Amino acid sequence: MKITYTGHAGLFIETQDCKILCDPWLHSNPAFFKSWYVYPPNEESVDWKMIEDEVTHLFVSHVHRDHFDESYLIGLFSERPDVQVILPDYKYADLEQRFIDIGAEEFLREGHHGNKVGETFLKTFVCETIDREREDSALLVIDNHQSFLNINDSKILPEHKEWIDTYLPSFQCGIDMMACQASGASYYPNSYNYDMLVKKEKCDLHRDRTIERFMKIKEELDVKKSIVTAGPPIILDEHMTHLNHYGDNASVFHDHWQVKEFDEDDS
């Protein structure tokens, strides 16, 4: 199994039977009123032509615009309508309909215990069904006794861990590698008029909780290697750079070196 990072939460997973593009998002297609984009730019650092020529499956974890890059996907399906969309068993059909609207024709729907593509096993976990915009999912890929769990922004619930503990031993492997974000994109509490000391305490608590979440998942699933994806974010507007993490200031964002160091054993 080979895994290539394409920026933000994007990954290209290659197995002996399939090649899966996960959450592709290009710097040239900013999201959220053009305020949020991949940095540094990933158009030149990633061989997109190779990926688009070879991809067999597409996995988009959820509908947020930093994961569902509509402009890119329209172009992909216009050239490769044969690419099969891995579709989690969502409560709502919004994601499937959005794919249909932009030209997707082939779907791989979640089976009772996952799906097999040749000898590669694929399993999705639906993690949130609070409302239509917050349905999220994770993808487990098992190939030749190697496994990769792409968690991205989602959560691993007790029933997901139970499934992994029950069925993974039959594949003669554990969770060899996971990809998961460890920062989040919240502007709270910086967007509130708190006293500076209170604001710093809340920022520190937020950062600690995101790190604890990452480490808890890693420890509970006994993950051997891990990749931090989708962040940490950074604000580039000059009048707002004080909201980034510098030393001991009040910021909800992690310093990039801090995130690297907390999981440095897996480098």
At which residue positions do the language-model features occur?
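A short helix->loop->beta-strand "cap" motif at the edges of active sites that frequently abuts
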Residues: 18, 79-84, 104, 222-225, ...
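Metallo-beta-lactamase
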Residues: 87-146
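Active-site environment of divalent metal-dependent phosphoester hydrolases
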Residues: 29, 63-68, 92-95, 115-116, ...
